[in-house]
Each structure stands twice: as structure tokens, then as C-alpha cells.
Amino acid sequence: MSNYRDCYFDNRGPFNEFEGFYSIVNCQLAMMKDYQRNEGLFKAIKKYCKGKRVVDFGAGTGLLGVYALMNGAKEVWFVEREVNLHPIIENLARINGDFDNNVDYHICVNASQIPDQKDYFEVCISECVGDSGIEDTMTYEFGKITRKHPNSICIPDRIEYFWSSVYVDEVEKEIKYMKDFPINYVDLFGKDESPFCPMNAMRGCSLRGYHNIIENKISTLDLKNYPTEPYVDMRFSLNNSSIEQEHNFIVLHWKCFTEDLEILNNSPQRHKDSYNHWLQFGFRDEGFKGDYSLYTNVHTGLVNLLKYIDENDNKIIQGLNFKYK
């Protein structure tokens, strides 16, 4: 899911056609509307859950755990902290399955209430993925569960990060708009020195329909061997000779896998008419050359974009806190 908290959404920008404050049901509906997300998760559940003991961590309305029951899981534990969703999970399981008498399922508030026996669960499921790949503290908590069940199948078991260069018409429109703006923002810190024209900080975006991009691997976050240290330095290098001349924006995106099966992504290669409930993040830096880092707190989801000036010094282009209110 994206980083929703306390049943409302901040004012960073329109989520889709429906703006304003969101209830927890709106958040769940937004995930259900992401067809590609559902297809990937369902494919993995069909492949791995039959006859298995399953935990669905961050269960929401119970969508994934119920689908596991429908596909032959013998036992499912739903872990969802929002107790107002528990009746929905119960009813969803009731109306969607004529389950065998041997099938068992449980609904609980947190992971302390699930069986603590090592390797009790054979499949660990969580849509513990946010806009930046990491979903607040949820991904970290899922990592704790997977450590207790090292022989389990994890859906997903890793997040792979990429950067790609693209041409975004909106960037050029913004530059022209700011140059024509009646108040001079262009020369804030000297001639043509401004953070606004173009905006050179990391920012949220929702790019789709870029089918011919080159995906450049940044790093992999292993969800079965989750980092115990809070910060991970995901470094990558840009070389302007490898970026097409007309490209004006770097988009950062990710893919999630279970073994060799890709199940989730927020790639700009998605069809332009598809609905993607995740944002991407990206930036524009004049010259597109140098060493960068997604300096990430993998316990909280806080991500900074750094640009390294040399080996001993670094410059923060912008640090973004991806948490909501």
C-alpha cells in the first residue's frame, strides 16, 4: 500500500480524480483498483499457498489472506492493527469461501499474537510496499516476521530499485511558466540560480506509458534478510553520455519479486491508461552527471536523495520524509 496513516491523506497532490480526506475504506479501494498489483499478488498466491500455513501481515480488508484460503491454504493468520477492519475480514472470509472443515483462520491486531514457533508459517504475505518501496515501519516489521520463518516463501521476498532517464513535457512547461512568472523566482541566488527553475529536488510523480526506457539497477533490499542497521546507502552513478540528449528527468522506481516471479512494480513502463496507486520519485539535475544515493532509513521509510561532490563531502539535493500526517 501507499503510506496512509490515521485515515487521512496529506495535501501533496491529487491521488486520483477523488481529492480530499480519505477514509480507511477509500485507501483499500485504491489498492483494489490497481489491477496490475492484484494480478501479480494473486499469481504468487496461486503458485505458493495451496496446503500451506500462511500469515497475511498488514491484512487490511483481508484481500490477500482470503484469496490464499480460496486457493487452498490450510491455515491463515490475518494481522491488522486497524480493528475497525476486522469485521470486514471476517465477513469477506465468510462470503467468499465454502472452506473445508480443516481450514482454520485467525484475526489479530499485531504480530505478537501469532505463533512464535520457528518456521511455523510456510508462506509470509505482506503488501508492505510504499511509494519509496518501503512502507513506513511496516516493511521493517515484516522483516522481523520473515527472520523467524527463514524457510518460508515470502510474497514478496525482495525489492529491486532502478533509475531511468525520460523526457517529461511537464518539466519544460514548468520552466517556461516560471520564466514568464510576474515575480522573479529565476534569479533567487544569482543569475539563473534558483531551486524553482527547474525544480532540481526529488519530487513525487506518476509517470506511465514510457515503454522504451532503460532500467539501470541501483540496489536490492532483501526482505528475508532485512537490515538490522537503520540506514542503507543505495548509491548509483549518472553519466550524461549514457542519457539520451532530449531526456530531462530521472525517475526512480522499483520492482518486487518472489523467487523468479515479478509481482509488483511502480515502473513508468506501465500502460498510460493503467491505474497505479503508488507514486514514483524523481529529480532533475543539470548535467545529469555524478554519484548519487538514496540514503534510506529502512526501519521508518525516511528517504534522502544525496549527491556526492567528492569522496569526503556530500550535498543534499533534498531530503523527503515520505510519511504522511
Give the residues covered by each predicted segment.
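Class I SAM-binding transferase module
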Residues: 2-57, 62-325
